[in-house]
Curated annotation (Swiss-Prot):
Modified residues (Phosphoserine): S158, S323
Keywords, in A-Z order: Disulfide bond, EGF-like domain, Glycoprotein, Hydrolase, Kringle, Phosphoprotein, Plasminogen activation, Protease, Secreted, Serine protease, Signal, Zymogen
One GO biological process term: fibrinolysis
Regulation: Inhibited by SERPINA5. Inhibited by SERPINE1.
Pfam families: Kringle (PF00051), Trypsin (PF00089)
Name listed for the protein in its UniProt record: Urokinase-type plasminogen activator
Subunit comment: Found in high and low molecular mass forms. Each consists of two chains, A and B. The high molecular mass form contains a long chain A which is cleaved to yield a short chain A. Forms heterodimer with SERPINA5. Binds LRP1B; binding is followed by internalization and degradation. Interacts with MRC2. Interacts with PLAUR. In complex with SERPINE1, interacts with PLAUR/uPAR. Interacts with SORL1 and LRP1, either alone or in complex with SERPINE1; these interactions are abolished in the presence of LRPAP1/RAP. The ternary complex composed of PLAUR-PLAU-PAI1 also interacts with SORLA.
Species assigned in the record: Pongo abelii (Sumatran orangutan)
Record InterPro entries: EGF-like_dom (IPR000742), Kringle (IPR000001), Kringle-like (IPR013806), Kringle_CS (IPR018056), Kringle_sf (IPR038178), Peptidase_S1_PA (IPR009003), Peptidase_S1_PA_chymotrypsin (IPR043504), Peptidase_S1A (IPR001314)
Length: 431
């Protein structure tokens, strides 16, 4: 009973003192306070210290900038409160049991410097292209980009910007080798990606296939995407688009002036032969594509010059997560596969003689990620001599991410003469 009375008396003293002017005492002890925060303690518990933060900051060390609504650069020093991914899913807390098993978490020795703590706010501790967080997807946490915009997108330049030019294979975000499997991305990471849609009689529009911008006026895709509806008037093309059915800042919309399908295209039970198409595009104003941080051309390879087998390459698209899915994902996805030799791909338990020298095979060594329905026509890009190069066009395959059934791609280096003969603008192509 005496112990209980003593505790009650202590509580009364603390509460009464907190109403006075001497509740907090600034102390020289190091609390690691940031952004002008001061280290303080209570009069009766001088061995307990914490940070007293300026108005716009919060967190244990005043490390959270409550006023920050956008990120600068790649967001490495972003300390705002965005806490959802681009699909609107909540981020996991950096100190949650699930995240503590990952590489970046709140218990790291450098967590404070990286902005990680007892919160679920988006951060960029590993210098990726923008802030991200861990999101629970199924049974495991996945790295996902965050719903927070670049401060530069909302700034008006004080002086006229330099004229932008197309520089094939260059992207504002650094190459990342980490669409069954894979991860969500934004168009800045694949600025040559073209989203192709088909108009219907009732006025509705549906996504058909992907494509790649090879010059300001030309997109290359796969013939099988258009063979059933070959009228150019049926199609529209978007460049600079990250989301399937909603607007992306800076995107451009184009009509199809000319649709060229390969005259020798054919399809077997499974394989597609000469599966390549060209779309000449123009806007309502009659202009071709204009370069920006979200719109860029992809380099074309030289004749028969393909990366060596085993090279890691990127595939991009709005393809389904699984072949049995009904809907396409709303956000653009990207993943990495490795090129497979023709000899291996022509093995009987792979595809046998269905694979020809006009095709390339690529797959994830663990068979966990692959192109899938809806990725057709999209790019397979590989780094070649320091530039991202269009090595293949998504064409066909059995299922999605099935063991011993890699994705098969149209071999772009084989079709260079065909591309040049139809575009008639070799100097304007991204060679």
């Amino acid at each position: 009973m005496r112990a209980l009375l003593a505790r009650l008396l202590l509580c009364v003293l603390v509460v009464s003192d907190s109403k006075g002017s001497n509740e907090l005492h600034q102390v020289p002890s190091n609390c690691d306070c940031l952004n002008g925060g001061t280290c303080v303690s209570n009069k009766y518990f001088s061995n307990i210290h914490w940070c007293n933060c300026p108005k716009k900051f919060g967190g244990q060390h005043c490390e959270i900038d409550k006023s920050k609504t956008c990120y600068e650069g790649n967001g490495h020093f972003y300390r705002g409160k965005a806490s959802t991914d681009t699909m609107g899913r909540p981020c996991l807390a950096w100190n949650s049991a699930t995240v503590l098993q990952q590489t970046y978490h709140a218990h790291r020795s450098d967590a404070l410097q990286l902005g990680l703590g007892k919160h679920n706010y988006c951060r960029n501790p590993d210098n990726r292209w923008r802030p991200w967080c861990y999101v629970q997807v199924g049974l495991k946490p996945l790295v996902q980009e965050c719903m927070v915009h670049d401060c530069a997108d909302g700034k008006k330049p004080s002086s006229p910007p330099e004229e932008l030019k197309f520089q094939c294979g260059q992207k504002t975000l650094r190459p990342r080798f980490k669409i069954v499997g894979g991860e969500f991305t934004t168009i800045e990471n694949q600025p040559w990606f073209a989203a192709i849609y088909r108009r219907h009689r009732g006025g509705s529009v549906t996504y058909v296939c992907g494509g790649s911008l090879i010059s300001p006026c030309w997109v290359v895709s796969a013939t099988h995407c258009f063979i059933d509806y070959p009228k150019k008037e049926d199609y529209i093309v978007y460049l600079g688009r990250s989301r399937l059915n909603s607007h992306t800042q800076g995107e451009m919309k184009f009509e199809v002036e000319n649709l060229i399908l390969h005259k020798d295209y054919s399809a077997d039970t499974l394989a597609h032969h000469n599966d390549i198409a060209l779309l000449k595009i123009h806007s309502k104003e009659g202009r071709c594509a204009q370069p920006s941080r979200t719109i860029q051309t992809i380099c074309l390879p030289s004749m028969y010059n393909d990366p060596p087998f085993g090279t890691s390459c990127e595939i991009t698209g709005f393809g389904k997560e699984n072949s049995t899915d009904y809907l396409y994902p709303e956000q653009l996805k990207m993943t990495v596969v490795k090129l497979i030799s023709h000899r291996e791909c022509q093995q009987p338990h792979y595809y046998g003689s269905e694979v020809t020298t006009k095709m390339l095979c690529a797959a994830d060594p663990q068979w966990k990620t692959d192109s899938c329905q809806g990725d057709s026509g999209g790019p397979l890009v590989c780094s070649l001599q320091g530039r991202m190069t269009l090595t293949g066009i998504v064409s066909w395959g059995r299922g999605c991410a099935l063991k011993d059934k890699p994705g098969v791609y149209t071999r772009v280096s084989y079709f260079l003469p065909w591309i040049r003969s139809h575009t008639k603008e070799e100097n304007g192509l991204a060679l």
